[in-house]
């Protein structure tokens, strides 16, 4: 073969391996978002955020709040998709300290924190939005021809 017709070798595929599983957690049917605060893992379970120790899997905290989908952590606060808004939560007190509108008007499906911004995925619209965490303003949008449920 000539160099014009040869293809680069594809990397060998390995089967996925489950390294660790957590749960089940009491009174929890599903998990809709997960983030790590440097010490604990936080899981959004519909009506509350559950914190657990990643080494043992033991729950360490529970914050009652609406949590429909994605969860993110900025180094100080938790951010939680809750219906048509994003709540900024103080993890020590569980209090919502601010709220901004969610870009998908209730159709948001995942969230992450990176580059000083929130990144919000919209599964149905196949978009990921970079959001200003103080104002909720969409800074940019990435469109995809594939599912974009979680930007993490």
Task: Place the predicted regions along the sequence by residue.
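Beta-rich, blade/repeat-based domains predominating
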Residues: 25-38, 65-75, 103-115, 145-152
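Conserved beta-strand positions in repeat-built beta-propeller and related beta-rich domains
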Residues: 27, 41-47, 78-84, 120-125
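Short loop/turn segments that connect beta-strands within beta-propeller blades
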Residues: 53-57, 90-94, 132-136
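A structural motif specific to WD40 beta-propellers
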Residues: 58-60, 97-98, 139-140
């Amino acid at each position: 073969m000539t160099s014009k017709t040869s293809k680069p070798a594809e990397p060998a595929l390995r089967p996925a391996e489950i390294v660790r599983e957590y749960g089940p957690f009491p009174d929890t049917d599903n998990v809709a978002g997960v983030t790590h605060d440097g010490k604990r893992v936080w899981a959004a379970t519909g009506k509350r955020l559950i914190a657990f120790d990643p080494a043992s899997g033991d729950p360490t905290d529970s914050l009652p709040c609406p949590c429909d989908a994605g969860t993110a952590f900025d180094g100080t606060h938790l951010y939680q998709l809750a219906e048509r808004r994003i709540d900024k939560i103080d993890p020590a007190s569980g209090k919502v300290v601010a709220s901004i509108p969610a870009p998908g008007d209730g159709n948001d499906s995942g969230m992450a924190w990176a580059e000083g911004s929130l990144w919000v995925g919209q599964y149905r619209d196949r978009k990921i939005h970079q959001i200003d965490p103080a104002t909720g303003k969409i800074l940019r949008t990435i469109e995809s021809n594939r599912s974009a449920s979680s930007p993490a």
